[in-house]
Amino acid sequence: MATYEVLCEVARKLGTDDREVVLFLLNVFIPQPTLAQLIGALRALKEEGRLTFPLLAECLFRAGRRDLLRDLLHLDPRFLERHLAGTMSYFSPYQLTVLHVDGELCARDIRSLIFLSKDTIGSRSTPQTFLHWVYCMENLDLLGPTDVDALMSMLRSLSRVDLQRQVQTLMGLHLSGPSHSQHYRHTP
């Protein structure tokens, strides 16, 4: 079980982008979260029993923070990588796909994506990051685990056919396979 001290130390070591990734994976969205907001969210999840040590470890792994796995959780990142290759993820294929796309888009792509969807999202909530854009689109029911058409359309508009194909490939198994809940261990 992750202690409050470990959670606070993890939170202190994460940058703004990493904080957003961890919260996205945990199904909590706070755009550009502050340290206090992240600590509060992690504590609340722990108190609710929704944040376990293995879940935190996979979050940090997916956020690319192998240093924190090693230094704070005392896990060998290579061990965790091998373990995750042989077991189901805590996260849905949709979350992992969104995270993959987030890592592949440059700042210019994200600005273009936001500009192209400005009429759809509206001016009251202008996203600053890709994950914030995803959150806005999900709130409008235009994007979700069973509907990635808007994302693929936007990637096509950005001339990122490479990413569009990757999304199709990553989500293809999910959309055509058995029910969503059978693909991953649980939704945090």
UniProtKB/Swiss-Prot annotation:
Pfam families: DED
Domain of life: Viruses
The protein's assembly and partners: Interacts with host RIPK1, TRAF2, MAP3K14, IKBKB, and IKBKG. Interacts with host CADM1; this interaction is essential for chronic NF-kappa-B activation.
Record-linked Gene3D superfamilies: Death Domain, Fas
Species per Swiss-Prot/TrEMBL record: Human herpesvirus 8 type P (isolate GK18) (HHV-8)
Annotated keywords: Activation of host NF-kappa-B by virus, Apoptosis, Host-virus interaction, Inhibition of host apoptosis by viral FLIP-like protein, Modulation of host cell apoptosis by virus, Repeat
PANTHER family reported for this sequence: CASP8 AND FADD LIKE APOPTOSIS REGULATOR (PTHR48169:SF3), DED DOMAIN-CONTAINING PROTEIN (PTHR48169)
Official protein name in the record: Viral FLICE protein
One GO process term, biological-process aspect: regulation of apoptotic process
Ranges for domain DED: 2-74, 93-169
Cited function: Plays a role in the modulation of host signaling pathways by acting as an activator of both the classic and the alternative NF-kappa-B pathways. Thereby, initiates an important range of cellular processes to promote cell survival, proliferation and protection from apoptosis.
Database matches in InterPro entries: DEATH-like_dom_sf, DED_dom
